[in-house]
Amino acid sequence: MNKLTDEFVLHGRDIEYDYYYTSHRRNEILETIYNAYNKLNIEPFKFVVLNEKSLKAYVTNKKDKKSNPTFTRMKTDHLSSLEDFLKQRIKPKGEINHNGVVGPQFDSDTVYSRHKTVKKVKLEDFKILKVIGRGSFGKVCLVEYLPTHETYAMKSLKKDILIEQEQIENTLLEKKILQTIDYPLLCCLVFCFQTEERIYFVMPFLSGGELFQHLRKFRTFSEEKVRFYGAQIALALEYLHKKGIIYRDLKPENILMDDQGYLKLADFGMAKKLGENEKAMSFCGTPEYLAPEIITMEGHDRMADWWSFGILLYEMLCGLPPFYMENVDKMYDMIKNSQVKFPKRINLSDNAKDIIQKLLEKNPKKRLGYKNGIEEIKKHPFFDKIDFKAVEERKVKAPFIPEVESDTDVQNFDEEFTNEEVGMSYIPKKNMEMIKKNQGMFKDFSN
């Protein structure tokens, strides 16, 4: 078997010729063969580990055997037992064993730990249980922290992609925001560490899954639910705004639910720190949630978040964002020029319509929240029945409790992700060379 790749070759005295395979589940396959072989044979199963770009040069094929029945290309010196191999958990760099335990690879650099008693964490401290999400720069997995057996969500970010897409600075800002926030309605950073290939953010695991999954299941929410969820999101946004942070990517996919039906805002990849009276000029976010001032690139601030909040309220009540169209250019034109319309099939209260219309005001200086932030939201009649302080302190019973059977239950996450194999993707040699050449760009993650 190859120490550098997923290759392995089956070779034996009684086998006509060698069998060559490549599989990310190699360890699992070999362990199965090992158990079956040892039941039928007295002599234990043996193997050879090679450090090669490819094992193809060591494969004895049909043509070789036909020319010379005793010929073999296989190296049979330095044979070892499979037990030794399985103990070592030899895997290609960046890979994870079939049972989810991360194999030895690089020394980890612990960048941040929220727990004062834990000074250092490394990849080997975590067992990967399930894939629960995927983003532009990597995947999110449910993991078990082996020293305490606690479950967390671990977001892995591939350094080669961060370099190629010039996202190192944004990722560093995301890390700084995650480690400084301390608020019950926001996902915070528990650990952060890096290896040669990746950066890892470890955060609380919220077993209720994305709000998006529940909205897709129920299609729309009642006004009671929307008031409860809206109050939490408004509080989370106001917390960020008071710290000079604009969120800029509000959508149901970035809102997570815990097992008690409460929400947390997650994923700060688009967030930005702004000074007083400063405006951001970049064009970023999810198209159907973009405020007009982002599309026109006239400069935006916290008011862009309140626009997105209005879009979110509409989507929760009506099932789709108000200006959604498959043609993005036409959608942008509608966002800039069209007034919001409400579907007749849904019986919305006047208060629900009014708050949405005031949040979706094209002029940010006339938009609800411009003068006095969340206080204007709280005072709107739509939220009359909500005690914001009680919601913040989790004293209000959630109108919906997600079904959760255990600490590792992932039924509330998309099966597209949870059915994936729990392995880290292979990073090509040329990309590894690029990472090594630019490793200095990640030094600030250790500060």
Language model regions located:
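Activation segment signature within eukaryotic-like protein kinase domains
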Residues: 229-230
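Conserved N-lobe ATP-binding subsite of Hanks-type protein kinase domains
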Residues: 139
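Conserved short submotifs of the Hanks-type protein kinase catalytic core
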Residues: 197-210
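Eukaryotic Ser/Thr kinase distal regulatory-tail detector
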Residues: 352, 392-447
